[in-house]
């Protein structure tokens, strides 16, 4: 009796799993195109980002006034410089200021790659690997620029260039290791990361240097 129940449970589990797979397979093309478009839109919004749009951003409470034709809201929307209007200005402002700065544009390329891989049904193992590479490169770039911002602290060097992630992590590292130490660790991390990408054998390199 117990064996029969376990077989029924296993059968239902496989049936539900196959339904999920068939749904994804059936709509794979649609999902891939949607993801590709989202990535392309994200890239365009970041490319056309300007701090000037910050003063023209419509708050959540004002979104409803767009439909009622509020004059002040309409003027804000007309002064928006982003190529994708209010939505592009809002998305780019969040990504640039609250993630990796201008390096967050790589998030758009990640979405495009996901869309292409799904569309052509390619091996997703490589896709996951390169997604990690691009995310880590975005983080390291943000960290490097955050170090430059905090060490040199010029007014021309805006915080948007590194984002809050790079600025925060760089601040912690500078407090722990000093400016020179933080920059050294960041640059070494870059070299090790690039070595992994091109598959450098660091042991062989060390041996050849020793010889």
Go through the PLM ranges and name each one:
Residues 1-211:
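Alpha-helical transmembrane segments used as membrane anchors
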């Amino acid at each position: 009796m117990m064996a029969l129940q376990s077989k029924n449970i296993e059968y239902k589990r496989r049936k539900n799993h196959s339904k999920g797979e068939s749904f994804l397979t059936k709509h794979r093309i649609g999902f891939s195109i949607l993801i590709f478009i989202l990535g392309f839109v994200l890239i365009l919004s970041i490319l056309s980002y300007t701090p000037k749009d910050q003063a023209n951003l419509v708050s959540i409470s004002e979104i409803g006034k767009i439909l009622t034709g509020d004059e002040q809201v309409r003027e804000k929307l007309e002064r928006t410089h982003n190529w994708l209007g209010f939505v592009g200005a809002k998305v780019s402002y969040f990504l640039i200021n609250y993630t990796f700065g201008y390096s967050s544009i790589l998030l758009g390329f990640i979405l495009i790659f996901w869309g292409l891989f799904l569309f052509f049904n390619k091996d997703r193992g490589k896709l996951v690997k390169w997604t990690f590479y691009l995310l880590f490169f975005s983080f390291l770039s943000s960290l490097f620029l955050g170090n430059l911002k905090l060490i040199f602290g010029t007014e021309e060097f805006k915080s948007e260039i590194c984002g809050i992630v790079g600025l925060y992590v760089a601040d912690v590292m500078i407090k722990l290791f000093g400016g020179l130490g933080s920059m050294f660790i960041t640059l070494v991390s870059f070299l090790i990361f690039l070595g992994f990408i091109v598959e450098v054998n660091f042991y062989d390199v060390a041996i050849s240097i020793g010889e």
